[in-house]
């Protein structure tokens, strides 16, 4: 883009002219180059080393610190900016600078080629009116499937609020208007299910939140073998009701209609996968496996199975190399059957990044997933994580914010945004966002972990220690928590305690997978470089997904001067935009 606009200013990149309204603002070459670099990457931390390489390369004999400080001072003066209360340029202590004003460029779009929709719809949890509480999986599973189907049907014209925010209102007595205001949703779909033997009764109604006006309602009484047709009919009727002028026709993704048992297993898998953290992961894996065993051509179930297999690697329920290979097989099968399944493309993006280090292919897969279903929050979240790992922090936060708009109460999405702030060096913001997440769920272990890491980098080691000790009360034998605690103990000078924690983590290897990547972190804290690199080499052989964060993670800074570090990063295929920063 030739013209970059921000606030009252615009910079013509070709003519190198900065203007405020009709007036030309005089700016010397170096401040102008710094401004251009910041405008290309709004929200990103531009490090002092990066500025040195860009403006004062090797062989330039200047007092770098004095020259950079003078250039920043002149730039702030030209913009009328205040270093203490910045409207444009924020100083990130010990790192560099960040441009904090929005810059409306295509590159800063939250999603590849899609703007946020103006209208949003929330599918509220369907009530289970059956006497049998074990049928809860059916009402919750139906809710989740409607969320999944309406995304592609509405094709980005109407944003579909995600499952975490939807499930928050399960059993709520709040009025439609209040729920709509809380989630910024204009429409609500609500209903109930009642199962009696081989018959099922489903009632659904579409409501305009602001006026609480019912736009459409329908009651279905079918045999359980017709669940699929009911679900497809409900999704289609919603999309064609008052929303029909906004929504182009699209094909819903449904299961094979001659496999009702597979669909029932699929719903049970969705129900388990919706549970917090990794609580239901193993059960979800079992049900999705049963679904695709009964119906090998069930593409949506194969995609869901692939997603859970990736999660098995991320949560270390299984050796990552094994789990990711299984996920690739499932995702490939899903796309061969139906290339329009958004989730299968999103998982394929994860696998390109985790297994192959092919970041361009990963970005293309995420883009396709979001194109097929712009309400796919998991795809947006994964895309944001990839951007953060490439040091494209402004774009990463924009993608995460788009996902958060669709599912504001999803802890995973909020955590990705917080982690992005942490690796960008914005520790105080990361700390504040972690505390907000812990207000939502005080037992969210990931938030305690990121909070501890940010506190440690901010020089508040005792507080970091307290957070990890608190996290351990929720899961006393988690090897990652033990490794992170060992790292903090080591940094604080408690060597014997750190070594004891490492030994405790390693003792778990008899019964479960203990990720060497996190043991490497503990050894780094102790200054044990040989042990750290040995563990990182093993993490590479295991294809640990966390290894992609190596060059982003500030706690590994002590290893970066070691001659073994750069070859390892090259082997992992961490993106060039990160390497050398």
Q: Which residue ranges define each predicted feature?
A:
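Amphipathic alpha-helical protein-interaction segments enriched in hydrophobic
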Residues: 479-484, 513-524, 548
């Amino acid at each position: 883009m030739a013209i970059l606009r921000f606030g009252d200013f615009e910079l013509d990149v070709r003519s190198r002219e900065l203007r405020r309204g009709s007036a030309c603002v005089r700016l010397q070459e170096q401040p102008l180059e710094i401004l251009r670099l910041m405008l290309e990457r709004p929200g990103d931390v531009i490090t002092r080393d990066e500025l040195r390489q860009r403006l004062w390369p090797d062989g330039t004999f200047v007092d770098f610190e004095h020259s950079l400080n003078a250039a920043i001072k002149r730039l702030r003066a030209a913009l009328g900016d205040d270093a203490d209360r910045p409207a444009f340029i924020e100083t990130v202590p010990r790192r560099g600078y960040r441009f904090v004003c929005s810059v409306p460029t295509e590159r800063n779009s939250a999603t590849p080629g899609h703007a946020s929709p103006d209208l949003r719809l929330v599918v509220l949890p369907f009530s289970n009116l059956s006497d049998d509480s074990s049928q809860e999986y059916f009402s919750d599973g139906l809710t989740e499937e409607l969320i999944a189907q309406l995304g592609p049907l509405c094709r980005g014209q109407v944003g579909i609020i995600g499952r975490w925010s939807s499930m928050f209102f399960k059993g709520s007595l709040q009025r439609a208007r209040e729920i709509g205001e809380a989630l910024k949703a204009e429409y609500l779909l609500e209903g109930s299910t009642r199962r009696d033997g081989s018959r099922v009764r489903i009632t659904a109604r579409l409501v305009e939140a602001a006026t609480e006006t019912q736009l459409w309602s329908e009651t279905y009484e079918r045999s359980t073998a017709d669940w699929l047709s009911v679900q497809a009919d409900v999704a289609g009727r919603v999309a064609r009701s008052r929303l029909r002028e906004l929504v182009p026709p699209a094909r819903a993704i449904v299961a094979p209609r001659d496999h009702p048992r597979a669909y029932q297993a699929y719903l049970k898998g969705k129900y388990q996968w919706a549970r917090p953290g990794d609580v239901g992961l193993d059960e979800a894996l079992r049900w999705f496996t049963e679904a695709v065993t009964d119906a090998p051509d069930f593409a949506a179930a194969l995609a869901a199975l692939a997603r859970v297999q990736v999660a098995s690697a991320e949560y270390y329920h299984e050796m990552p190399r094994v789990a990711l290979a299984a996920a690739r097989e499932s995702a490939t099968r899903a796309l061969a059957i139906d290339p329009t399944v958004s989730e299968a493309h999103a998982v394929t993006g994860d696998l390109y990044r985790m297994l192959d280090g092919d970041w361009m292919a990963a970005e293309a897969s995420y883009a396709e997933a979001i194109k097929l279903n712009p309400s796919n929050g998991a795809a947006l979240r994964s895309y944001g994580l990839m951007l953060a790992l490439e040091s494209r922090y402004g774009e990463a936060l924009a993608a995460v914010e788009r996902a958060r708009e669709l599912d504001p109460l999803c802890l995973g999405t909020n955590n990705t945004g917080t982690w992005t702030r942490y690796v960008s060096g914005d520790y105080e913001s990361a700390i504040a966002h972690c505390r907000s997440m812990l207000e939502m769920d005080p037992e969210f272990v990931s938030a305690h972990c990121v909070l501890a890491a940010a506190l440690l980098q901010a020089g508040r080691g005792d507080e970091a220690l307290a957070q990890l000790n608190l996290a351990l009360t929720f899961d006393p034998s988690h090897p990652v928590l033990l490794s992170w605690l060992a790292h903090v103990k080591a940094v604080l000078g408690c060597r014997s305690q750190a070594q004891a924690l490492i030994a405790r983590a390693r003792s778990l290897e008899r019964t479960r997978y203990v990720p060497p990547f996190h043991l490497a972190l503990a050894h780094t804290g102790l200054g044990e470089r040989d042990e750290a690199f040995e563990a990182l080499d093993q993490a590479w052989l295991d294809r640990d997904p966390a290894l992609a964060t190596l060059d982003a993670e500030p706690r590994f800074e002590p290893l970066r001067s070691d001659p073994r570090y750069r070859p390892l990063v090259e082997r992992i295929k961490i993106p060039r935009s990160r390497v050398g920063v």
